[in-house]
Amino acid sequence: MASLPRRLIWSFSYILRESFPIVSRRNCVSLLRASWRKVLSVGVGTSVCAIPVGQRSEPTLSSESLIKRAVSLVADSSSTFLSQTTYALVESLTEYTTAVYTLISLQQKYTSLLDKMNSNEESAIWQVIIGARVQMKQLKEQYLKYESSWQRAVSLSEMAAEAAYQSGADQASVTVRNHIQIVQTQVQQARNQAHIAEVQLAASQTDEIKRTITEDKGNPPSGGSPRSSLSEEEEIPEAYLRED
């Protein structure tokens, strides 16, 4: 009777071996490793997805920072205004200076040809001189207008520099003040050149008036001569007529 259970167990084992072949140890290990890799991959991916991702937000700007930004923009705008007015003024002063020297040259040529021209030639040259004088006065009015705008630009830039300094925008304040000094130097140089030309023009006109008066005493000119109207049309500063 005891052999019957053993036979049953052996038969059952045989059936299992035929239906499900035994897998080698190496294949089992590989299968286990692959299974664990899949499990780990799924686990790690699930963990990463579970981590909340926060959005980066810019720090809130303080009122002081906003004021500094605003005053820096004001400083930049005032510097632009100052640059434009400086360019216009310097260019206008240069044109005026050129016109003054042109008038000086015409008057000197006119004086050197006084004894060599008839009345018609003298009148023609005098008309050219009058035209040059009108142009010079127009250019002077133009540069005076630009000078007024330039002075307002300087005042505005100075206020912007002070506002930048008071607001803590030191770099903007220093930049504007340096810009003011540079443009003031440029304008002063142009003014000096114009002043030198005006002094030479006044001296030339004074010499012409004195020469005309001397010649008129020896030989009174006929009425309506352009030379006789020189002293009436020209306004010579008293400082240039004074003899030291």
UniProtKB/Swiss-Prot annotation:
Keywords: Apoptosis, Mitochondrion, Transit peptide. GO terms for biological process: apoptotic process; positive regulation of apoptotic process. Coiled coil: none annotated. Residues 207-218 have a biased composition (Basic and acidic residues). Residues 207-244 are annotated as: Disordered. Gene3D superfamilies: 1.20.58.70. Promotes apoptosis. Acts by opposing the inhibitory activity of inhibitor of apoptosis proteins (IAP). Homodimer. This is Diablo homolog, mitochondrial. It comes from Xenopus tropicalis. The gene is diablo.
